[in-house]
Swiss-Prot record:
It comes from Acaryochloris marina (strain MBIC 11017). Keywords: Cytoplasm, Ribosome biogenesis. This is Ribosome-binding factor A. Signal peptide: none annotated. NCBIfam families: rbfA. It comes from the Bacteria. It is found in: Cytoplasm. Belongs to the RbfA family.
Length: 138
């Protein structure tokens, strides 16, 4: 079992190499249909399984097409990783779509909407009625 430091170093190396492959060596047109970037790599402690999280910018159709292209290129990516990274065993590669950027944008837009509603809402009266008034007795 590899140490935590080694796992994180190998994960960063895989992230860098897969990013380079996406830019230069994967020739599948489906992969180029959406703007794509590798956001993270989750590597198992025994260095046998790598989940590669990718963020795809584009329409839903482009995302689906890009994910299909990545899934078909999984064998090629694993083979290239074996040539570029010298490990005893090359990890199994699984591509996962990372939608955290979109979810973050949705949360920010909701927060801006709430802030805008609060600014446009008239301020409620925070003054308490005098002690001897009729409203205070109710």
């Amino acid at each position: 079992m590899a140490t935590g430091r080694r796992v994180s170093r190998v994960a960063e190396l895989i992230k860098r190499e897969v990013s380079q492959m996406l830019l230069h060596s994967i020739k599948d047109d489906r992969v180029g249909s959406g703007m794509i970037s590798v956001t993270a790599v989750d590597l198992s402690g025994d260095l046998q399984h790598a989940k590669i999280f990718v963020s795809i910018y584009g329409t839903d159709e482009a995302r689906a097409e890009t994910m299909a292209g990545l899934e078909s290129a999984t064998g090629y990516v694993r083979k290239q990783l074996g040539h570029r990274i010298h490990l005893r065993r090359t990890p199994e590669v699984i591509f996962c779509e990372d939608r955290s950027f979109e979810e973050g944008n949705q949360v920010l837009s909701l927060l801006h909407k709430l802030d805008h509603e609060r600014q446009n809402k008239p301020a409620a009266s925070t003054e308490k009625p005098p002690v001897g008034s009729l409203d205070a007795d109710l």
